[in-house]
């Protein structure tokens, strides 16, 4: 489970649930097609699993 994840926002937040918006912001994503790197840990994976329709995830 160690390693890094590249998380990219691929869908807009317009009209989305406030909880989903907060999760995207907590991941550090501010706009469409922005990519961030995070360590692969249960907290990050939990956030990603709640918004799979808004982001893509790649292992680095």
UniProtKB/Swiss-Prot annotation:
GO molecular function: structural constituent of ribosome
Entry keyword annotation includes Metal-binding: no
InterPro entries: Ribo_uL30_ferredoxin-like_sf, Ribosomal_uL30_bac-type, Ribosomal_uL30_ferredoxin-like
GO cellular component, one term: cytosolic large ribosomal subunit
Membrane-spanning segments: none
Gene3D superfamilies for the chain: Ribosomal protein L30, ferredoxin-like fold domain
Biological process per Gene Ontology, one example term: translation
Keywords, ordered alphabetically: Ribonucleoprotein, Ribosomal protein
Similarity annotation: Belongs to the universal ribosomal protein uL30 family.
Name of the featured protein: Large ribosomal subunit protein uL30
Organism: Desulforapulum autotrophicum (strain ATCC 43914 / DSM 3382 / VKM B-1955 / HRM2) (Desulfobacterium autotrophicum)
